[in-house]
């Protein structure tokens, strides 16, 4: 159960501050996998937190999923468990977006985002896929650093062409670009009378980014460079060389049906400057793009 109190203070039409006070009561239930776990009691914890955001928004809506202008958010968030222990979390980050109107309602949008966190109850970012991905797939072959005391997890998107968890860690950085072409409107020279056709968009996109543990993506303590192999009596640790940054590119179709914007994407992932899977990957998701 959670409770929030949000205070907004606008300086003018485009600048504002937002303060969020929150409390959360959580119950952790151990899965009854055997007799031992069946007897373990549930644990309950109370968390308190505060989030401060600076918002800049000069955007103007052109049509569904099409806009021009700038959007920027800087944020800091702190959470503390309201008990005798000292489990806490501090998250810092930003999200900056800019969309340029090219011709009629055709736009080119870019997004840069990054975040990191410190504390005794860490947040792990799983990079890969898109927001609101239907039938999402998770890559369980990528190792997660077990030396961190993770209390939360979230996705770092977009990274089209890969499953979730192509990269993970306590920090992430991401850059995306999209050319959005409302081709029906462009062919007709104006908006037609049917929203289904008006909303049709061809998207050409590209993503690049990484998630990591350690100070930088190239730090030796980045868990990306370590692999553990357990095979019977053999236990081995392997250090490997791999580029921490991955990318993706492809094309997609956007269309609105019954008020829902459907996103169909086909993407190819790039790792170590090579296409990871020449067959590519199909992604179906809901909602607007960034």
Regions found by a protein language model. Name each.
Residues 7, 96, 112, 177, ...:
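Hydrophobic, well-ordered secondary-structure elements that form the walls
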């Amino acid at each position: 159960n959670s409770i929030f109190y949000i205070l907004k203070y606008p300086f003018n039409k485009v600048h504002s501050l937002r303060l969020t006070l929150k409390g959360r009561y959580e119950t952790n239930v151990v899965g009854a996998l055997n007799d031992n776990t069946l007897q373990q009691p549930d644990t309950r914890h109370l968390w308190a937190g505060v989030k401060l955001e600076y918002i800049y928004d000069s955007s103007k809506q052109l049509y569904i999923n099409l806009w021009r202008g700038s959007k920027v958010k800087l944020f800091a968030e702190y959470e503390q468990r309201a008990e005798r222990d000292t489990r806490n979390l501090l998250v810092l980050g930003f999200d900056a977006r800019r969309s340029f109107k090219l011709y009629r309602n055709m736009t080119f949008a870019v997004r840069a985002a990054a975040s990191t966190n410190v504390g005794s109850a860490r947040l792990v970012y799983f990079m890969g896929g898109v927001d609101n991905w239907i039938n999402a797939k998770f890559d369980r072959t990528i190792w997660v650093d077990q030396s961190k005391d993770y209390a939360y997890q979230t996705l770092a998107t977009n990274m089209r062409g890969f499953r979730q968890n192509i990269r993970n860690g306590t920090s992430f950085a991401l850059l995306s670009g999209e050319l959005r072409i409302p081709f029906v409107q462009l062919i007709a020279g104006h908006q037609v009378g049917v929203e289904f056709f008006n909303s049709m968009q061809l998207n050409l996109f590209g993503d690049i980014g990484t998630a990591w543990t350690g100070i930088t993506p190239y730090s030796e303590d980045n868990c990306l460079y370590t692999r553990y192999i357990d095979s019977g009596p053999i236990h081995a640790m392997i250090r490997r060389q791999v580029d921490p940054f991955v990318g993706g590119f492809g094309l997609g179709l956007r269309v609105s049906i019954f008020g829902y914007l459907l996103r169909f994407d086909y993407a190819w992932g790039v790792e170590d400057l090579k296409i990871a899977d020449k067959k590519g990957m199909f992604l179906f998701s809901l909602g607007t793009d960034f």
